[in-house]
Amino acid sequence: MVDVSPERFEELVDDALDAIPDELAALVHNLVVLVEEEPPPGEAQDLLGLYDGSTLGLDAAGYLPDRIFLYRRPLLDYCRTEAELVREVRVTVVHELGHHFGLDDARLHELGWA
């Protein structure tokens, strides 16, 4: 387990988002990324991230943004070093963003983002 402050964790998330290529980021609309300490009751407590929304192009609500949740405590527990945490935050951001673009877990695994 690695331990970083909530502020440092937010920096790592911001860095992961900044690393998304501009061409891809330009396609993202009505999406927010939120950091929570742990998954909600009813979800696996080792869940690293979660996409909550509709697939891009299939906007059902039109008003409320789709959401990517990153769960700080499970990510910290999963990683032994800050370098591992940097990588895992990036992988989790890309994985959940992939769901926004309609990719399922099997395809994300094939692409190395699972």
Model-found features: residue ranges?
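Active-site rim/adjacent substrate-binding subdomains
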Residues: M1-E88, H100, A106-H109
